[in-house]
Amino acid sequence: MKQFLNVSDIGDLKQALQEARQVKQTPFAWQHLGKNKTIILVFFNSSLRTRLSSQKAAMNLGMNAIVLNINGESWKLETEMGVVMDGDKSEHLREAIPVIGSYCDMIGVRSFAKFEDRDFDYNENIIRQFIEYSGKPVISLESATVHPCQAFADLITIDEYKKKDRPKVVLSWAPHPKALPQAVPNSFAQWMNAADADFVITCPEGYDLAPEFAGSAKVERDQMKAFEGADFIYAKNWASYEHYGQILSKDMSWTVGARQMAVTDNAYFMHCLPVRRNMIVTDEVIDSPQSLVIPEAANRVVSAQVVMKRMLEGLCL
């Protein structure tokens, strides 16, 4: 595996889930693969679960992990080509990336959407430069449009808790005071479609995801109707794709609470975290026995470790 951005990079999902079960049962069984190997985790944006789970996954595999927080610990980096660097950016990615690559065996990169230019964000210009110029395997730790480590962890969690072969999974938009990227819902939709779940997206008008990510998912404007008979509810805010980066609604009736959960088939509640309580979801729901947010977060170590393990195995070939 040379890169991990999309569900296609992981290959057969049944095999990936089986590998995840093995990793979860015996997390230290592959430490020989990571001996004398180093991963550098590059963060352009804040992180809690992604940073810690990636470091833990690397340690489980016997690797050294170096974390670089770009905006607080290094030179400010220019990301666009062809610019005159007469501002506050001291170094260009074109030089920084191969330097970083020379210090490690694989790289993880977190770089959120800027919401300034949809084409720039959806072309994944920053992480694509890491893939092109580093000469090393690259993992998306959430880029402008995708968060594959999160989506893989979500799939692992659903696989662990599902009570039927093809559960009904609902991705529900929920209100938030800030404009949030589409990376998490994009990846969740992409992975649920690939897993052939009974998958429904419910969101207000103007919040449809990009077609390449929504795929064949049914889109339902009526949240209550979408929730009927659901086995898993995944709540998440995202800004508009059509009116790029804009907040079109803060309708609190979309907050996931007991009223909505009552029409499900005793569904589990999921969220990637961090979550705005009583905006995205009520205390009653997130603190209930049906809430999976903590085991879901714990599976971030498992998903990251499967990906890193495969990359290490590729280095040994």
Q: Which sequence ranges carry the predicted segments?
A:
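Phosphate-coordination loops involved in phosphoryl transfer and adenosine-cofactor binding
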Residues: 33-39, 166-168, 266
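A short helix->loop->beta-strand "cap" motif at the edges of active sites that frequently abuts
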Residues: 134-136, 197, 262-268
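Phosphate/diphosphate ligand-binding glycine-rich loop within oxidoreductases
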Residues: 34-40, 47-159, 276
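Positively charged, low-complexity intrinsically disordered leader regions
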Residues: 1-52, 56
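Glycine-rich phosphate/diphosphate-binding loop of Rossmann-like nucleotide-binding domains
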Residues: 44-66, 159-235
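C-terminal helix-to-coil terminal segments
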Residues: 287-317
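Rossmann-like adenosine-cofactor binding region
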Residues: 212-291
